């Protein structure tokens, strides 16, 4: 509201820059000390004391008074060890009291280390307030007795079941046969056609062989293996479709429709695949503007991945 608003008035006693209280002679403390024989500018304490030679200008200045909220002594342990309201030099004073009381140097060193740890903890608490270290439990040691018991149980089971051993020995050759069949299936078609003589086979015969092999599989296989085989068969079909689309029309016929009359007369409704056509299908490359576009996209990706080039661009701009 500007000048029409309520004015904020502060008392002189609440002003931190006010030093009138130090010069006033009507205060309670000034009156008590003057009644005890103290005069302004004089030192505190007896004038003829043995330690009067240690008095300095600081002895005549104002002192700081801290009100205690407990009835503990000077060397007592505070309630909050992380509190920083301790007077300066109290740790040295505590060490001195400990030496006078007959404490050894080892105990004094331990107390000094404890104080340093407390100071570090207070610094960490002020710097990172919500930090808490929790053990993860990954380095837990296993009990050796428990492992021995498990090994003994396994040995007993093996000795008590000789029939299970025979069954496992019989199952091993079956598993090896299945692995050989799967390897034979996973071999690429072009390697077979190039290594051996160019054998011509129809797709129908290939489908029949795959069906025969699928019937020979033992029905006790797990569901996961069946799912994997289905996925593999789907991938093969997709690869065959992609190869048919990429191979030129003059080499492979599509569904019984062959481009040449001679090939149509030789094979009625059958599709023949040669090794050269498979090699050409695998070496499919874009032509024309697709080559330029793919190069441009590749250069753009490489430039974005390079951090140094990006920094240079930003620096120059």
UniProtKB/Swiss-Prot annotation:
Residues 171-182, 224-236 have a biased composition (Basic residues). Keywords: Nucleus, Ribosome biogenesis, rRNA processing. Residues 192-219 have a biased composition (Polar residues). GO terms for cellular component: nucleolus. GO terms for molecular function: nucleic acid binding. Its main location: nucleus. InterPro entries: G_patch_dom, PINX1. One of its GO terms (biological process) is rRNA processing. Residues 154-170 have a biased composition (Basic and acidic residues). The keyword Isomerase does not apply. Residues 152-268 are annotated as: Disordered. Residues 25-79 form the G-patch domain. It is found in: Nucleus, Nucleolus. Involved in rRNA-processing at A0, A1 and A2 sites and negatively regulates telomerase. Belongs to the PINX1 family. This is Protein PXR1. The lineage of its organism: Eukaryota, Fungi, Dikarya, Ascomycota, Pezizomycotina.
């Amino acid at each position: 509201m500007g000048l029409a608003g309520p004015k904020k008035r502060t008392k002189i006693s609440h002003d931190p820059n006010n030093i009138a209280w130090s010069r006033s002679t009507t205060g309670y403390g000034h009156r008590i000390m003057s009644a005890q024989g103290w005069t302004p500018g004089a030192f505190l304490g007896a004038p003829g004391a043995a330690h009067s030679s240690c008095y300095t200008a600081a002895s005549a200045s104002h002192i700081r008074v801290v009100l205690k909220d407990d009835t503990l002594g000077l060397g007592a342990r505070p309630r909050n060890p992380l509190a920083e309201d301790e007077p300066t030099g109290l740790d040295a004073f505590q060490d001195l009291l400990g030496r006078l009381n007959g404490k050894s140097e080892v105990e004094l060193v331990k107390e000094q280390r404890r104080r340093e740890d407390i100071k570090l903890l207070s610094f960490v608490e002020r710097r990172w307030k919500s930090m808490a270290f929790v053990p993860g439990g990954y380095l837990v040691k296993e009990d050796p007795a428990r492992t021995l018991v498990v090994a003994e149980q396994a040995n007993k089971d093996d000795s008590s079941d000789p029939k299970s051993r025979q069954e496992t020995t019989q199952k091993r050759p079956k598993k090896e046969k299945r692995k050989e069949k799967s390897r034979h299936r996973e071999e690429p078609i072009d390697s077979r056609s190039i290594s051996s003589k160019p054998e011509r086979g129809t797709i129908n015969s290939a489908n029949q062989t795959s069906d025969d092999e699928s019937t020979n599989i033992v029905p006790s296989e797990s569901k996961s293996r069946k799912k994997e085989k289905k996925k593999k068969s789907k991938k093969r079909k997709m690869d065959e479709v992609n190869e048919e689309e990429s191979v030129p029309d003059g080499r492979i016929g599509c569904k019984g429709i062959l481009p040449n009359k001679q090939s149509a007369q030789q094979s009625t409704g059958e599709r023949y695949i040669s090794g050269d056509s498979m090699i050409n299908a695998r070496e499919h490359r874009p032509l024309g503007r697709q080559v330029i576009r793919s190069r441009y996209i590749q250069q753009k990706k490489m430039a974005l991945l390079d951090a140094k080039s990006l920094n240079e661009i930003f620096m120059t701009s």
